[in-house]
A protein has these predicted regions:
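Short, small/polar residue-rich loop motifs at catalytic or cofactor-binding pockets
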Residues: 106-108
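Short hydrophobic/aromatic beta-strand element in the GNAT-like acyltransferase core
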Residues: 40-42, 110-112
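Glyoxalase I/VOC metalloenzyme domain signal
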Residues: 1-9, 13-35, 45-100, 114-127
Length: 127
């Protein structure tokens, strides 16, 4: 049986404040912000239909990365890509936008950051 046509739409990040986290990703990526309704705020790529959605939760607990036993674990993380020639500029930009550098880095070709509410994300430098 052939699979029905299902396309990727978005990644949703829980957070304590939609506006603040969306503003961080707008600054980081240069994407546009759009409110779908009272509950959903999106940051949308200008190059495709892909978007990040932000959902406020009253009991938000930031994930701990790397994992620590007994602490909130990450459920997923975002991966972005940039040119190796722009590595230092991209890292400086991410930090200026409000990201922090993760305490553990596993690969030379990728840098792990933590967004303002604790979600880890990577920027890989290939090309």
């Amino acid at each position: 049986m052939a699979a029905p046509n299902i396309s990727f739409a978005s990644v949703t990040l829980d957070c304590p404040n939609q506006e603040e986290l969306a503003d961080f990703y707008v600054a980081l990526l240069g994407w546009r912000k759009e409110r779908f309704d009272e509950e959903w705020l999106a940051v949308i790529s200008p190059d495709s239909h892909i978007c990040l959605l932000f959902q406020e939760t009253d009991d938000y607990v930031p994930p701990v990365w790397p994992n620590e036993e007994g602490k909130q674990q990450q459920m997923t993380h975002l991966d972005f890509a940039a040119s190796p020639k722009d590595k230092e500029a991209v890292k400086s930009h991410a930090l200026a936008c409000g990201a922090s550098l993760a305490s553990v880095q596993y690969f030379e070709s990728s840098t792990v950051f933590i967004d303002p509410v604790g979600h880890p994300f990577c920027i890989s430098f290939f090309g």
